[in-house]
Amino acid sequence: MIPMHCPQCNKISIKNGRYKDFQKFKCKNCSLQFSERSLSFFHRHRYPEEIIRNSILFCMFVSTRISKFMLQETLQFKPSHVSIYRWTLKFANHLANLKRSRSFSNIWHVDEKFIRVRGSKDDFAYLWVVIDDKNNMITAHVSLKRDINGAVAALTKANKIAEKPPDILISDGLQAYKKACKKVFGRKTKHFQAHFKTVVKMIGNRLYFLSNNRIESLNSKINLWYKRFRGFKRLATANLWCEMWMHFYNLIRPRVIPHKTISIHAII
């Protein structure tokens, strides 16, 4: 058996009884008491780990109140909808701080859609989404206005995450993308406008059939998830939830195009 080390002084600890199904430990050096859960995502939670994981997964598709009903009917546990919301919020912050290196292709698609955020000057705020041609989400950014500043912020964020500019950027007819692409990526990145109709372009020695239907299809999936919120209370909260769904889409959610997925057990 591998000995347990103290998280505070790194000395070998001794067993000190049990709490429910968890082994407790006590450090011989600093007398710190802790358990197997002390440094995990589930520290100081009284519900079992599977209940918390399932509630978080349910919340990716339905509201917290429906998640509460599903847990009660399937697993006979009755956490409050507020507890489920707090678990999901903690998971969102955990994903935001998770550093994972991903590789993206050289063809990117960008689009924006309106969402409701309390406090926005217009009737709506705007969610900017950048993906590559393999359906991997690179970034999701929420801004209060649909202008060049929002486009620059989204593309700058995507460039920082991917650590390289794309060769081709495809967008709809919004003129802000043209200036934002030149400002963020420079002249080496080719920008093309292609909405629902396919645009045929010869670049170098290759013929490209360019369309933005790929990201329009993703927007329909975002709508199904966003519908359960009915809007966000703050801009920071909107960015946090949208980034959480982006990580969920990239890492966990199965897609038509084959890609490597991981279980939520590998994250928390």
Task: Indicate where each model-derived feature is located.
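Active-site beta-loop-alpha junctions of metal-dependent nucleic acid enzymes
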Residues: R46-Y47, K90, A140-K164
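Short, cysteine/histidine-rich loop/knuckle motifs that typically chelate Zn2+
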Residues: P7-Q8, N29, K221
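Short Cys/His-rich "knuckle" micro-motifs
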Residues: I14-Y19, R37-S40
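Short, positively charged, Gly/Tyr-enriched micro-motifs
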Residues: K26-N106, E112-K121
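Residues immediately within or flanking Cys/His clusters that coordinate Zn2+
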Residues: P3, K24
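C-terminal domain-tail junction helix/linker
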Residues: R228, F232, N239-I268
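A short, conserved beta-strand element enriched in hydrophobic/aromatic residues
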Residues: M70, A125-D147, A154
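Short amphipathic alpha-helical "interface-anchor" segments enriched in bulky aromatics
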Residues: S63, L207-M246
